[in-house]
């Protein structure tokens, strides 16, 4: 055996130098230890609660007992900890630990805003959110209050003596994106609405523009946020900061503005105070939908009185972390931006919903499964009472259509007999499909329901806004037929009033905003036909058919007097971009071709604020008022004719001046031309006596005719 002496003084030293830096990371050396390092995910079940009573050390046990009872109503397994003050009392905050992240999320929603007693209200936040809070910057200063920006009369455009409407367009002018606001001039080219330098601007928006619902403001989108323009000079009225915003939406009464970033890393829909610019609420996209991106926009849908807004509830997950179908609607109060009754409304398999145009009533549709039929119905808010519902089996597709008056709601359903799944995952319906329109009459007792079966496939539907008629477009692309129905009192089914001539490629019907007139559109088709139909008669009558090949958009103006067809970017390739304006009867008034036309939007009008008595008075004197406008139109035509005649006279007078000046110059230089031509005056008038009349006969056509034989020829 060899003896080793560890105490040798001359043993070689293997230590690292003092300035040595190891390039091997801890992830390589000790991955098993780092795996156990606490992460922020471990605190997902922890909730921080502020607003608890501040008590002394002698009352801590009593406070802890009371808080435990309150929290155990939500989850028996909750653990609590009250951070002590230096004296042993409470600091007014509470740390809680819940079994999992779901129960913690439920606790946050339930406890945030909870009234513990008359003097204490809880404020609950995830502990992970508290960890993300940063200290205020040292350079932070108190914001300076901005001065009020007076842009003038926001409704100046409504005071036009001829009641003319305005519209805005976005197109390229000399290769530069330009937005302009125009006044529609009946029978003449549109004119810029106001100062030409202010009503039309290059690069006014970086993406798109939008009118506010009442037409008070024109909104433009920029990289740093949204700007609202108003007044006669289109001055900047408001600015809302939201970097890289892509989508915006107004509440019905112009009180709130919803914004969304879209396909960016930070995806947060926000709701802003429209007139103050104050950020009211910012929502987490993942919290709202369970996804990193919103499925549709506008995501929030507002009630007409702006008291509530709603969205589909985020889908939950089962024990295997598989996403379930959406089973409810989240309805928020605009005053507090919190859920009504602190919870969502449960509706299994809900697909979509929509608010009534006149009342806080929600219409919803939940799709069917193999075991559960489809359901469509009406929900009263905030009582959450279901006014009426109906269930139908084997529904493949459904759509809903509210009448503008809010009196009726139509549901279209396509029902199949049997379905099969192909290898590609595509669904095939076997045995044909049936098409139905179910109509809820909201103003009737217990909300009556009537059914209308359709003999042909459904294409589109629209209501007469204030009347009792509607139009259903049925058929296919080769033959589409508009059918007009009427709902009569005490009737159990709609009555077919007119079945109009079928057309090719019709795909949409639109009633005028004031009713009576109907447009049937064949958008994005080579023919580009539009039927104009008068439905105010006992039997609907087609008044005109117009053509605008490949147009992809059509709109009524807010008054229902004019209809525009547009070919814009994003339509069918090869279309001539531009717009055409027609009367409600289909007579063309204006045609404009524009380079890279992107948008055409009529300026909305605010709701009528007149009393019922005043409206009846206007209807009573409508003939006199109409005669006045007819006279103004005739005078304008005469004035236009006189202007044309006067313009022609001025042009002729200017031409005579030029002609006389040139004739005088020609006469003064005549002797020079005679000298150049060896004394021959080629410009002198010829003597008529030197002319000789000569007639020349020209045969225009010839023919061969057999001559009769003479007597001698006959004898020979």
Swiss-Prot record:
GO terms for biological process: formation of cytoplasmic translation initiation complex; regulation of translational initiation; translational initiation. GO terms for molecular function: RNA binding; translation initiation factor activity; translation initiation factor binding. WD repeats lie at residues 195-233, 235-283, 345-386, 411-450, 453-495, 501-543, 545-585. InterPro entries: 6-blade_b-propeller_TolB-like, EIF3B, Nucleotide-bd_a/b_plait_sf, TIF_beta_prop-like. It comes from the Eukaryota. Keywords: Cytoplasm, Initiation factor, Protein biosynthesis, Repeat, RNA-binding, WD repeat. Residues 45-129 form the RRM domain. The keyword Heme does not apply. It is found in: Cytoplasm. GO terms for cellular component: eukaryotic 43S preinitiation complex; eukaryotic 48S preinitiation complex; eukaryotic translation initiation factor 3 complex. Belongs to the eIF-3 subunit B family. HAMAP family: eIF3b (MF_03001). PANTHER family: EUKARYOTIC TRANSLATION INITIATION FACTOR 3 EIF3 -RELATED (PTHR14068), EUKARYOTIC TRANSLATION INITIATION FACTOR 3 SUBUNIT B (PTHR14068:SF0). Component of the eukaryotic translation initiation factor 3 (eIF-3) complex. RNA-binding component of the eukaryotic translation initiation factor 3 (eIF-3) complex, which is involved in protein synthesis of a specialized repertoire of mRNAs and, together with other initiation factors, stimulates binding of mRNA and methionyl-tRNAi to the 40S ribosome. The eIF-3 complex specifically targets and initiates translation of a subset of mRNAs involved in cell proliferation. This is Eukaryotic translation initiation factor 3 subunit B. It comes from Caenorhabditis briggsae. The lineage of its organism: Eukaryota, Metazoa, Ecdysozoa, Nematoda, Chromadorea. The gene is eif-3.B.
